[in-house]
């Protein structure tokens, strides 16, 4: 395995969206939701937020930005729009485009809020795709030369709807960016739970929306994976090297230019964990 020495790519993001439908009128909220997320990421401190949007005023189906920025390295990729088990239709990025990516250890986490892109059972009937878009993302390349994504979120059903996907997307990102939930699957679960508040017992064509979305949306990859929102910063520990180890306690401060909260400090004695503690919420002392 190769180890990444330059993690600055985690400061970069890519937002892809398509306002499209096979019958008019075209929806407008996929791009609107993505612009909202762009503002959130900008406020959070992302260095680069590239976009590839398809809409009525800009109908460029084959947008090279997707492949170029993916190859350059981005931490997260978010999609809202129109697609199926093959991939994203507008702008166009299918399974075949994944195989054309450069091998790269700078693998993003992909959030694909669009129909069927996570359909891992597409070939269950015997005549579907052997791998859906999400499976191709998470198994692309080889062990030594991977390409695609570290993990992806997507639905396994073809009949998701824009208004529900938007809510799921927005709440997930609120939980991640506001620091309440750092892991992938728990953040997705929070998005699913938000549908209860927004839509209650709503049924569409006899289908309970909340139950449906809880059932079809999932993670392909490690569900406990923390979503790194930017390059990890270097922590500084101010420790008195001459401090007597006969004392009943040892005090130190942990900072990264500003004091850090909830840092786990571990005291080792004879190669064994002797004591652990979190930095205090008041002055970040442990």
Can you annotate each of these PLM segments?
Residues 1-275:
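Cysteine-dependent hydrolase recognition
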């Amino acid at each position: 395995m190769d180890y990444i020495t330059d993690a600055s790519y985690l400061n970069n993001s890519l937002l892809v969206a398509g306002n499209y439908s096979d019958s008019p009128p075209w929806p407008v909220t996929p791009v609107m939701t993505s612009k909202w997320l762009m503002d959130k990421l900008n406020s959070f401190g992302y260095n680069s937020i590239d976009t590839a949007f398809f809409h009525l005023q800009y109908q460029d189906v084959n947008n090279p930005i997707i492949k170029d920025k993916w190859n350059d390295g981005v931490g997260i990729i978010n999609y809202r729009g129109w697609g199926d088990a093959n991939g994203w239709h507008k702008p166009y990025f299918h399974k075949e485009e994944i195989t054309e990516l450069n091998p790269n250890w700078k693998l993003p986490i992909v959030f694909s809020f669009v129909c069927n892109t996570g359909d891992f059972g597409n070939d269950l009937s015997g005549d579907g795709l052997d791998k859906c878009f999400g499976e191709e993302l998470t198994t692309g390349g080889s062990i030594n030369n991977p390409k695609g994504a570290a993990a992806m979120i997507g639905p396994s059903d073809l009949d998701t709807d824009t208004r529900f996907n938007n809510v799921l997307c927005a709440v997930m990102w609120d939980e991640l960016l506001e620091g309440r939930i750092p892991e992938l699957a728990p953040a997705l679960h929070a998005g699913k739970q938000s549908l209860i508040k927004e839509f209650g017992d709503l049924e569409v064509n006899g289908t309970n929306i909340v139950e449906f979305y809880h059932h079809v949306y999932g993670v392909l990859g490690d569900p406990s994976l923390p979503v790194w929102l930017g390059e990890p910063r270097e922590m500084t520990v101010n420790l008195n090297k001459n401090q007597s180890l006969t004392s009943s306690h040892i005090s130190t401060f942990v900072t990264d230019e500003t004091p850090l909260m909830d840092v786990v400090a571990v005291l080792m004695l004879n190669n064994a964990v002797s004591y652990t503690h979190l930095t205090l919420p008041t002055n970040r002392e442990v």
